[in-house]
């Protein structure tokens, strides 16, 4: 008898330890794991900032810390809910310069993360340039606000694309690109997914700058090597390499604090037509290389990369507007034919049939807008993990563990980032105070077929009624009335379930 008790006790101890280890490895350590620091304008933790964050201070775009901020958030002074296990709160400020900044919200970690994904927030002041560079990670960018010109090398050719709000563009790892904010007097806000699977192992991603800003990757080569490679004199090389050290985001025209010299890249963007072409020839005086040198065998020849970016040859100059580069795709253009819509809201899902580069990225994109008090019905994604960013309004995210217990019931507001593991049931509910809009990325570029657990198109209506009634322990008529009571599908009217709840109405008016 005593042996049996000890055996049972030992077994219970093993189960308990295993449960704790699984919880930790799955990334459910709770708020301590996610608590980044620093703040900044676009998300983060302590200090808040315009795009909100975790710690004290909040900020205009919501946050988790004390004070809440203009757009609310969790923690003291801003709503909250249960522990935000599926909120992405750990962030790093990777760029800070006179012309803008970039903050990266780090991917969650654990065994249930099938494909890690960081979320980046880039802010650029008017008339600024994100200097030419390439990354060790792929980017899928979404223009949240503003207009820009993207210069990128793809399929061994240089092309420029005009981007506006709603545009999506994929930049593969290793592709040289730059971004120029062309919006008149308007900040450029970009949200991007960052795929670290090809990275060198850095915490966020590693940029390699071609020219200007921080030290160019070219600056590490011996000067005599570069003068030979570029076929220029040493003074000309020094002019290229030492023109500016103002960070990776610089003003095209002189910024708030005038500098002795503007960059070659700034001068380049400020010129037009033939004047630009002549000035570039004067600066670099690059000669035609051998036929072998002109081939972009893998896109990594420094001479050809720079020539391609600057568009020095007549042939490239003529073809830059119609290169092999893919066009962007504007997700707002699909609002006329959304994936689903009713009077309670609409949703748009993009896969590789809509935008071919998504097939190479392995990432899908979605955009959801819920009217005040509406709910995206409880459902699960059988093919992908979902990452979401709140664009407008506020609401609740509810996630359920496989064992049927609540995993998260958290208030979210603008700038918050959340993730939903594959197969986990969840729903989103808009606040009664206004519409709730969020954009996001999925870990599959195939057509997403969410399985709804509630509504007129739910799985319960598809299953055998007799089996269902036995499973729930009720008679068939009761079961039928239960599953047929909701006549709407996908997006449901749920004012009673929507925040703010009783007792929160007064305080939430000021969130």
Swiss-Prot record:
Pfam families according to UniProt: Cupin_1
Family statement: Belongs to the 7S seed storage protein family.
InterPro entries for this protein: Cupin_1, RmlC-like_jellyroll, RmlC_Cupin_sf, Seed_Storage-Functional
Stated name of the protein: Vicilin-like seed storage protein At2g28490
Gene3D superfamilies attached to this UniProt entry: Jelly Rolls (2.60.120.10)
Keyword Acetylation: no
Keyword annotations of the record: Glycoprotein, Signal
Stated role: Seed storage protein.
Superkingdom of this protein's organism: Eukaryota
Gene Ontology CC entries for this record: plasmodesma
Domain Cupin type-1: 86-238, 329-480
Region (Disordered): 54-81
Signal peptide per UniProt: 1-27
Source species of the chain: Arabidopsis thaliana (Mouse-ear cress)
Residues carrying sugar: 231, 369, 403, 464
């Amino acid at each position: 008898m005593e042996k049996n008790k000890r055996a049972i006790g030992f077994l219970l101890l093993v189960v308990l330890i295993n449960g704790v280890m699984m919880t930790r490895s799955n990334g459910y350590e709770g708020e301590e794991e996610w608590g980044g620091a620093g703040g900044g304008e676009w998300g983060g933790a302590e200090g808040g900032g315009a795009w909100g964050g975790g710690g004290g201070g909040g900020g205009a775009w919501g946050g988790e810390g004390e004070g809440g901020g203009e757009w609310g958030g969790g923690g003291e002074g801003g709503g909250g809910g249960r522990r935000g296990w599926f909120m992405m709160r750990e962030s790093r400020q990777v760029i800070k310069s006179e012309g803008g900044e970039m903050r990266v919200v780090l991917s969650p970690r654990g065994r249930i993360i099938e494909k890690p994904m960081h979320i980046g927030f880039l802010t650029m002041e008017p008339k600024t340039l994100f200097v030419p560079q390439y990354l060790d990670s792929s980017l899928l960018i979404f223009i949240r606000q503003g207009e820009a010109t993207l210069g990128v090398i793809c399929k061994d050719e240089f092309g420029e694309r005009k981007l506006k709000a709603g545009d999506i563009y994929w930049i593969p790892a290793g592709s040289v690109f730059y971004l120029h904010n062309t919006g008149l007097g308007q900040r450029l806000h970009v949200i991007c997914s960052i795929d670290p699977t090809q990275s060198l192992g850095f915490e966020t991603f590693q940029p390699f700058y071609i020219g200007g800003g921080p030290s160019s990757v070219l600056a590490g080569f011996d000067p005599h090597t570069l003068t030979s490679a570029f076929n220029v004199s040493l003074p000309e090389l020094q002019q290229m390499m030492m023109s500016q050290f103002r960070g990776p985001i610089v003003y095209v025209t002189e910024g708030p604090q005038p500098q002795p010299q503007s960059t070659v890249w700034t001068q380049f963007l400020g010129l037009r037509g033939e004047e630009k072409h002549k000035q570039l020839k004067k600066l670099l005086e690059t000669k035609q290389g051998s036929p072998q040198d002109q081939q972009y065998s893998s896109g990594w020849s420094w001479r050809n990369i720079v020539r391609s970016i600057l568009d020095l040859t007549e042939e490239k100059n003529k073809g830059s507007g119609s290169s092999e580069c893919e066009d962007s795709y504007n997700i707002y253009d699909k609002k006329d034919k959304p994936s689903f819509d009713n009077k309670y809201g609409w949703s748009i899902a993009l896969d590789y049939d809509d935008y071919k580069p998504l097939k190479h990225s392995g990432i899908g994109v979605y955009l959801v807008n819920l009217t005040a008090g509406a709910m995206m019905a409880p459902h699960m994604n059988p093919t992908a993990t979902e990452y979401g960013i709140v664009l407008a309004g506020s609401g609740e995210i509810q996630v359920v563990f496989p064992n049927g217990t609540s995993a998260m019931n958290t208030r979210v507001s603008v700038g918050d980032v959340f993730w939903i593991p594959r197969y986990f049931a969840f729903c989103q509910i808009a606040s009664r105070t206004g519409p709730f809009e969020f954009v996001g990325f999925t870990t599959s570029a195939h057509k997403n077929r969410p399985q709804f657990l509630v509504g007129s198109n739910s799985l319960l209506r598809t299953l055998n009624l007799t089996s269902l009634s036995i499973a729930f322990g009720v008679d068939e008529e009761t079961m039928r009335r239960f599953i047929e009571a909701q006549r709407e599908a996908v997006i449901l009217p749920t004012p009673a379930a929507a925040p703010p709840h009783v007792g929160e109405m007064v305080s939430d008016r000021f969130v």
